[in-house]
Amino acid sequence: METNVPEKKILGFPEEMNSTIQFLSVEKTTCRLPVSIKFNIPKKISTKRRRISVEEEEEEEDENKTKLSSWEKVLSSDEILRLREVSRRKYLTDRENKKVEELRDERKDDDDVEGYRFPDAYDQEGCIDQKKRFDVAKERYCERRRSGRVVTEQEAWEDHQAQKARVRFGAKDKKQVVDGYEFVFDDLTGFVEESSEAETGKHRGCYSKTAAEKAREGREFLPIHGYREELLKLIEENQVLVIVGETGSGKTTQIPQYLQEAGYTKRGKIGCTQPRRVAAMSVASRVAQEVGVKLGHEVGYSIRFEDCTSEKTVIKYMTDGMLLRELLIEPKLDSYSVIIIDEAHERTLSTDILFALVKDVAKVRPDLRLIISSATLEAKKFSEYFDSARIYLIPGRRYPVEKLFRKCPEPDYLETVIRTVVQIHQTEAIGDILVFLTGQEEIETVETNLKRRMMDLGTKGSEIIICPIYSNLPTPLQAKVFEPAPKGTRKVVLATNIAETSLTIDGVKYVIDPGYCKINSYNPRTGMESLLVTPISKASAAQRAGRSGRTGPGKCFRLYNIKDLEPTTIPEIQRANLASVVLTLKSLGIQDVFNFDFMDPPPENALLKALELLYALGALDEIGEITKVGERMVEFPVDPMLSKMIVGSEKYKCSKEIITIAAMLSVGNSVFYRPKNQQVFADKARMDFYEDTENVGDHIALLRVYNSWKEENYSTQWCCEKFIQSKSMKRARDIRDQLLGLLNKIGVELTSNPNDLDAIKKAILAGFFPHSAKLQKNGSYRRVKEPQTVYVHPNSGLFGASPSKWLVYHELVLTTKEYMRHTTEMKPEWLIEIAPHYYKLKDIEDTRPKKTQRRIEEASTSKVDTNKKTRTSKVDTNKKSKR
């Protein structure tokens, strides 16, 4: 244990000298003065001493002259001469002694600057060589280690710090040599030098437990630990088991380990699905740490475009979409002994498809164990779907939560959120606050306004630390939500609904729930997806309230009346684009998708729209069976239109450029970012990728971004300068690498044609020809095949530029208007050339010059003639084969 001594003025020292004295720590158990004192003495002190000596000499000479003048009156001349001689000799002797003293002081001053004073024993022993000093210190360090006593990490750190401030050689029981100075101490705290990681690492390794050991010990304190034996018995007796356990009970991390310890991995792997890729990665990392193995060996994960597993892997975490893709290769899941579908209450699109598929697999594989894990009490529905499966409830670690309601909804709930945060901060006990908001825009708005409100309050209250968390936030900033707030402050976490179940933030005592979330909704009639702000369900409200009762009693402030909410959220399968689902089912040999065993059947018009789109893309034939093109498309873990674009690039000799564009589109809209205080510079940097003789469009601009980044050797600094998110670019590179490998797998020739922009645009159109629009007189656009008015998205490089007459777009989104996102200019005759089965001349007729019309007609005629010749040749071939 060490007691640190603060800075304190030393009596008799000049002011400038006092300001530089520092003291290192000293052991509390002894009454000795500090054994090692470090201080700095300015060089001008020696000059000041010399000046004082000269003044003393002058005063002494004046005094002597006065005395001589008085004595001259009474003494004879001989006596005066003799006395003068004696006085002169005495004066010279004293002066010589003073000079020697001054020189000694000057040398002492030089030695004391930036130096240390050793104890008397060191001076008496003489100079001890460097090796001997370190040997003495090392012996003292190893002495405690040999004693066999277990030392905690904190004690090891304290001992190491004390050793740095303690005398390591010479006699420790002697007072330090400091001539002529008196020190005054008080009880305040001083400072010791900060340890570097390299210095303290070895001590930490010797004295403290590893992170893996701590993680293993923490397993015993989870709520699920007491139910281990009972749980294993139920899994052995029941092929299908529905487990209900609150978030934080340990079901996700512990059940796979219990099964491994019980010997289930001898018959195959244990697979556990997660609805989000971030959850799959973080949980796998935690379990690998608890098991004590390297991530990717015995414990691994698999997410889209990333596989961190090996032949040794026996516990595998994955997204539900990845297990769905494994079913394409291994329909009976023969390599698995247990399948755990975790977070089943979220009812994602892939989860609902998995329910039906694993239900069928369990019927043909009696040895397979199927566990459905949920954090809500919707277990009865799961049990009924799986033929009255057994339900097992694991109690959570919950404290009482006081719920406060608003009688009527607030018109401006963001302002109410800010007022509630300030109210809690000023009136409630210490504890962190968790606020649920719908997305990044709302989080940034509340963060800005809350900071302004706290500045207006000034020093009336303690400080708050605002920690936002959303998907596009850089990882280091996301990690701040898990750091405890400094003493005397309060942390305010602004989060999306990811904090409902996927994240556990300790220290939260208050929850503010406005009662809204964003859900993705697809309109099959228009083919448009919209991210809508909608009220949450009662199940979600219960999850949010539970976040405040994990470490102690909490409060939940609800800005709504819970009676107005629906019991559960609408499953994603009833509000999503089903094209990829139908293509997957067709590739599995399931022809009748309308009578498929869905837990909640999707709308029929959504299934019809998906079948029509797949037929237009060439993935299905006239009777609804998958084609060779469809078999190649299903190999790519992307949207069917995107996969058709990749497959179609082979014809236009630009497959390398197209997979780059596909990878950039797959990372979403998180490539560019616009800081609030640098929006003009960010927009200018983004438009640099569009500059050309003509505006190239968003797809080509994304290609240029990736190629420029590659030329800069994948530089993070370059991304910062261009206002590009390096995290998104690295993910795009990983996606591109996997797409490149899949191209080789399906036998597509790798070609490059970077200078032929028309060829690249045609390849894009090969997959996205249903997404075409033409310019109207009022500046808006009209979809070619649908009577719908759409607009260029403000984030597009074509927004505000000279309008192009014809565009192809990546997707439609509904915000304030129906916007086309990621647009590129095209020529109308390409529609007839690429998709004559989908477009007719009347679809693209307008007031164009006759030459353009003639080119379109010629392209259409030549395409029809080619198709006729192809059909005729096929008929002739069939006749010859029959003969």
Swiss-Prot record:
Q: Name one GO molecular function term.
A: helicase activity
Q: Annotated motif DEAH box: location in the chain?
A: 342-345
- List the residue ranges of the region (Disordered): 845-883
**Annotated binding of ATP, by residue:** 245-252
Stored Pfam families: DEAD, HA2_C, HA2_N, Helicase_C, OB_NTP_bind
Recorded GO cellular component terms are: spliceosomal complex
Q: What are the Helicase C-terminal domain coordinates in residue numbering?
A: 416-589
- List the InterPro entries: DEAD-box_helicase_OB_fold, DEAD/DEAH_box_helicase_dom, DNA/RNA_helicase_DEAH_CS, HA2_WH, Helicase-assoc_dom, Helicase_ATP-bd, Helicase_C-like, P-loop_NTPase
Listed under catalytic activity are:
ATP + H2O = ADP + phosphate + H(+)
What EC number(s) does this enzyme carry? Answer: 3.6.4.13
Q: Which GO terms describe its biological process?
A: mRNA processing; RNA splicing
Q: Which domain of life is it from?
A: Eukaryota
Q: Which residue ranges does the record assign to the Helicase ATP-binding domain?
A: 232-395
What is the tissue localization of expression for this protein?
Predominantly expressed in flowers.
- The answer to keyword Ribosomal protein applying to this record is no
Alphabetically ordered keywords of this record = ATP-binding, Helicase, Hydrolase, mRNA processing, mRNA splicing, Nucleotide-binding, Spliceosome
Q: Which PROSITE patterns match?
A: DEAH_ATP_HELICASE, HELICASE_ATP_BIND_1, HELICASE_CTER
At the top of the EC hierarchy, this enzyme's class is hydrolase
Function description: May be involved in pre-mRNA splicing.
Record family assignment: Belongs to the DEAD box helicase family. DEAH subfamily. PRP2 sub-subfamily.
Q: What is this protein called?
A: Probable pre-mRNA-splicing factor ATP-dependent RNA helicase DEAH8
* Organism field: Arabidopsis thaliana (Mouse-ear cress)
